[in-house]
């Protein structure tokens, strides 16, 4: 049996505070942080104490619900004004991951018909908790759908961390490996270290070892050689935002892996919930790309590895064109090929069901 339930939850609702696993301290220290204010939540998201698109959305939803509990509003209109201010503030914490805006919009919709402040506060807490509950089942279904793509003994590559600690549980790209472990399918993962913040080495390698899943760590520059020498059968990654045409924003380095996979004729899969799709944008050119602190590149774990004043280009994400993606795995099935039409049909089918 897999040990996935021994892996700490990334975020938990505790009524008067939010408890998060500090992912900046992993793998050396398992530390929890208590978030009590909207500023705490904002900081936790910006500084990557919590990361992964679904986990960011859950944390932001909890943060908005927690802040709303403390509003001292004169009336419902004043409550909604304060709510909108905090929502805007939290929504600005990370611009690329669409789950953040999706979760906050869902909370907004949940109180649209509220007739009292107390009803609104209660509803917000309930809805935020429901988002987390649903995310766990969503991730399990993504894993179930993805599992059909692999066979016993496959060697599979991934980048960044789209695992249990990036979601409520299971993960997206890593979900099939937990389910494969239960079925004794013997899948093996090659995890790219994921410079500059090392989510692959610090988080994915740690998480999979905690779960008893076979994993080998490689540097990002070893990907092509590894594909050739280790007979990689597929690449699977997560996503932070997917455009209407299938173009996908994910951790920097994903685009390069997709190009390599295409060169080696290896299937390249994206695993993501429907909440990661942004049907308001036509293609990847419209996805905002966050640029982060230059010292993330100049330093490793606080130790300087480059000249102090060397200019740095540090985008946190890149865009993989839909043309390089073999399939997008969701909780409702897998879309392939003509993404604009298939994604539109997928959402239409979900509305009918």
UniProtKB/Swiss-Prot annotation:
The active site is at residue 240. InterPro entries: IF-2B-related (IPR000649), IF-M1Pi (IPR005251), IF_2B-like_C (IPR042529), Initiation_fac_2B_a/b/d (IPR011559), M1Pi_N (IPR027363), NagB/RpiA_transferase-like (IPR037171). It catalyses: 5-(methylsulfanyl)-alpha-D-ribose 1-phosphate = 5-(methylsulfanyl)-D-ribulose 1-phosphate. One of its GO terms (molecular function) is S-methyl-5-thioribose-1-phosphate isomerase activity. Keywords: Amino-acid biosynthesis, Isomerase, Methionine biosynthesis. GO terms for biological process: L-methionine salvage from methylthioadenosine. Pathway: Amino-acid biosynthesis; L-methionine biosynthesis via salvage pathway; L-methionine from S-methyl-5-thio-alpha-D-ribose 1-phosphate: step 1/6. It holds the Pfam family IF-2B. The record marks 160 as: Transition state stabilizer. Its EC number is 5.3.1.23. Substrate binds at residues 51-53, 94, 199, 250-251. Belongs to the eIF-2B alpha/beta/delta subunits family. MtnA subfamily. Catalyzes the interconversion of methylthioribose-1-phosphate (MTR-1-P) into methylthioribulose-1-phosphate (MTRu-1-P). NCBIfam families: eIF-2B_rel, PRK05720.1, salvage_mtnA. Homodimer. This is Methylthioribose-1-phosphate isomerase. It comes from Bacillus velezensis (strain DSM 23117 / BGSC 10A6 / LMG 26770 / FZB42). The lineage of its organism: Bacteria, Bacillati, Bacillota, Bacilli, Bacillales. The gene is mtnA.
């Amino acid at each position: 049996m897999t040990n996935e339930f021994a892996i700490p939850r990334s975020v938990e609702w505790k009524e008067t505070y939010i408890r998060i696993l500090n992912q900046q301290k992993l793998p050396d220290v398992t530390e929890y942080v208590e978030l009590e204010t909207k500023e705490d939540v904002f900081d936790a998201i910006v500084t990557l104490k919590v990361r992964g698109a679904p986990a960011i959305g859950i944390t932001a939803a909890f943060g908005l619900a927690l802040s709303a509990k403390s509003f001292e509003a004169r009336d419902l209109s004043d409550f909604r004004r304060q709510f909108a201010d905090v929502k805007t503030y939290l929504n600005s914490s990370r611009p690329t991951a669409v789950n953040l805006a999706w979760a906050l919009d869902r909370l907004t919709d949940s109180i649209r018909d509220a007739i009292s402040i107390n009803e609104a506060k209660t509803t917000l807490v309930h809805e935020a908790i429901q988002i987390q509950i649903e995310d766990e089942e969503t991730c399990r279904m993504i894993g179930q759908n993805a599992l059909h793509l692999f066979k016993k003994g496959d060697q599979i590559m991934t980048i960044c961390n789209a695992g249990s600690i990036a979601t409520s549980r299971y993960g997206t790209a890593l979900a099939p490996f937990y389910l494969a472990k239960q079925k004794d399918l013997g899948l093996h993962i090659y995890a790219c270290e994921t410079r500059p913040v090392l989510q692959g080495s610090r988080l994915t390698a740690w998480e999979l070892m905690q779960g008893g899943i076979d994993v080998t760590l490689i540097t990002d520059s070893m990907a092509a050689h590894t594909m050739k020498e280790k007979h990689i059968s597929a690449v699977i990654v997560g996503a932070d935002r997917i455009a209407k045409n299938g173009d996908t924003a994910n951790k920097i380095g994903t685009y390069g892996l997709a190009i390599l996979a295409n060169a080696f004729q290896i299937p390249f899969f994206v695993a993501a919930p429907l909440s990661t799709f942004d049907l308001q944008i036509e293609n990847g050119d419209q996805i905002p790309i966050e640029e982060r602190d230059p010292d993330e590149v100049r330093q490793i774990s606080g130790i300087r590895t480059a000249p102090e004043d060397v200019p740095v280009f540090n985008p946190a994400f890149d865009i993989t064109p839909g043309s390089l993606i073999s399939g997008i795995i969701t909780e409702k099935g897998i879309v392939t090929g003509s993404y604009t039409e298939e994604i539109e049909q997928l959402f239409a089918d979900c509305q009918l069901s």
